[in-house]
């Protein structure tokens, strides 16, 4: 048996029904991976993923917030230099006599902060939300285009 994982799909361990380590079994320590405040029920929303890209014109932030409404999300500028994206999602719990087999939708609060560079226009920040993706655009200050300067030097002698 090889201890090196296969990156090409030839991992014999995962295909063997006789290998006890390849079976999906109950793991008594699985619940210890997260503190109780970050249980599986809330961890997806508390770990909101954000991409930050810089273009020639702006800094663009994209946050995946599946299932959230724009009313549940706040975009703020703190201290004229920090972009804060936060929100909270509540899951409506039905108290019926139904038998639940799995509950995986997440709820809870999240907050992400990003220190912005000095070359941005804080008063022109825009945010939009479409299909569970929040896009925040922070325009950059146009830098004065440097003109090529030519200075003639007198030659003495």
UniProtKB/Swiss-Prot annotation:
Localization terms from the record: Cytoplasm
Phenotype reported upon loss of the gene: Reduction of OEP7 targeting to plastids.
CC annotations in GO: cytoplasm
Free-text tissue specificity from the UniProt record: Expressed ubiquitously at low levels under normal physiological conditions.
Expression triggers: Accumulates after heat shock.
Keyword vocabulary terms for this entry: Cytoplasm, Stress response
Annotated sHSP domain residues: 41-156
Record has Signal as a keyword: no
Subunit details: Homodimer under normal physiological conditions. Aggregates in high oligomeric complexes after heat shock. Binds to AKR2A and to chloroplasts.
Function summary: Cytosolic mediator for sorting and targeting of nascent chloroplast outer envelope membrane (OEM) proteins to the chloroplast. Functions as an AKR2A cofactor to facilitate the targeting of OEP7 to chloroplasts.
Family, per entry: Belongs to the small heat shock protein (HSP20) family.
Name by which UniProt lists this protein: 17.8 kDa class I heat shock protein
Protein species of origin: Arabidopsis thaliana (Mouse-ear cress)
């Amino acid at each position: 048996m090889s201890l090196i994982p296969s990156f090409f799909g030839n991992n014999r361990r995962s295909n063997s029904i006789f290998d006890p380590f390849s079976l999906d079994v109950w793991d008594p320590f699985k619940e210890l991976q997260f503190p109780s405040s970050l249980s599986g029920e809330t961890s997806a929303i508390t770990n909101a993923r954000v991409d930050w890209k810089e273009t020639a014109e702006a800094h663009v932030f994209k946050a995946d917030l599946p299932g959230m409404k724009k009313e549940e999300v706040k975009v703020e500028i703190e201290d004229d230099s920090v972009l804060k994206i936060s929100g909270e999602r509540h899951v409506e719990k039905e108290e019926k006599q139904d038998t639940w087999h799995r509950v995986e939708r997440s709820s809870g609060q999240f907050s992400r902060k990003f220190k912005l560079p000095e070359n941005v226009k804080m008063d022109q920040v825009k945010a939009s939300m479409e299909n569970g993706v929040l896009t925040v655009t922070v325009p950059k200050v146009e830098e004065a285009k440097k003109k090529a300067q030519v200075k003639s030097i007198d030659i003495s002698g």
